[in-house]
Every structure is written in structure tokens, then in C-alpha cells.
């Protein structure tokens, strides 16, 4: 089993839960690891660097695969909010290794009258090693032979978001 994948399984749910409670909001985060570092990318800044547009599925697939290659990442985690048909809100976390291992977790969260997150279920025992919550995770670690113009765009985008990517040494 990949060290970075196991590290993300062990640490990412609690780190992300703490971030949600600190900021009182569920923001999409993409985290990726090599064998020594964990990197956090908060996608909320994408409208500022992407012509007013957020990060759609196609851009997420391209950019995550670009980052995986650039950082030699061996595992990627993704967390964001989802809402069920019955309006139950939950955080969906997916972790995928370059070898295709998947781990997924759902945690219910509650908000107050101002839509600020007040609580996130701390029970991390309900996980699944089978199917990701967000199917886009299945596109991570796919080889993409980027055309020159797409690669130039991704390099430019990377230079703009690079200062915002947080780097954390893996805990021993």
C-alpha cells in the first residue's frame, strides 16, 4: 500500500474537519502527496485566476493530473460538500492512489440560520474502499497527452495558484 495514500487516510479527514469548523464553511480542497510532503489546494480562488470561472470537472481533471505529474504525487484527496435529495448535507472525501486504491468517507454537517457550519460529524468509521463519492476522482492519475496550448494554459494557471498551495511535511 502506498505510504502517501495511507497517510492521507489517516490524517486528511481530521485536518479537513478542523478547517471546516475553523472557517465555518465547506470549501472544496484538493490535497496531494509525494513520499515527503502533503500539498493543499483550496479551489475557492479559481474565479480570481480563471477569468471569473471556478474549477469545472474538465479543468479539475486536467489540473489535478498536471499537478500529479509536476509534484510526482502518489496519492490525491478531494473533499467538498454534497446535498442529498432529502437536503441532508454532507462532506464527501475521496482519496485515490496512483495504483488505483480508493478510500471514501461521508460526514454529515450542520449549518446555522446564516449557513455557517456549526458542526461536522466526527465519526470516521463509516468509510468505503470501493466507490468514490465523486466520480471525477476516477480520472486522477490518468495519463493525458496535453496539446501545447493546453499545457501552456495549465502552466500559467499553476504559476498563479502556486503561491496559494500549502506544503506540509508528512508526519513520521
Task: Name the predicted role of every residue range.
Residues 1-58:
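N-terminal domain-onset segments
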Residues 60-172:
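Low-complexity intrinsically disordered segments
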Amino acid at each position: 500500500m502506498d505510504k502517501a495514500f495511507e497517510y492521507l487516510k489517516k490524517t486528511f479527514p481530521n485536518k479537513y474537519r478542523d478547517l471546516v469548523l475553523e472557517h465555518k464553511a465547506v470549501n472544496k480542497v484538493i490535497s496531494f502527496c509525494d513520499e515527503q510532503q502533503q500539498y493543499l489546494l483550496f479551489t475557492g480562488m479559481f474565479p480570481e485566476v480563471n477569468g471569473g470561472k471556478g474549477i469545472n470537472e474538465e479543468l479539475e481533471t486536467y489540473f489535478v493530473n498536471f499537478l500529479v505529474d509536476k509534484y510526482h504525487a502518489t496519492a490525491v484527496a478531494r473533499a467538498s460538500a454534497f446535498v442529498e435529495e432529502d437536503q441532508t448535507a454532507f462532506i464527501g472525501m475521496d482519496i485515490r492512489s496512483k495504483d488505483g486504491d480508493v478510500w471514501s468517507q461521508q460526514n454529515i454537517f450542520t449549518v446555522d440560520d446564516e449557513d455557517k457550519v456549526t458542526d461536522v460529524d466526527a465519526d470516521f468509521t463509516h468509510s468505503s474502499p470501493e466507490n468514490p463519492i465523486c466520480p471525477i476522482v476516477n480520472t486522477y492519475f490518468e495519463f493525458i497527452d496535453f496539446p501545447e496550448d493546453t499545457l501552456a494554459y495549465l502552466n500559467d494557471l499553476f504559476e498563479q495558484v502556486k503561491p496559494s498551495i500549502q506544503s506540509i511535511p508528512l508526519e513520521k
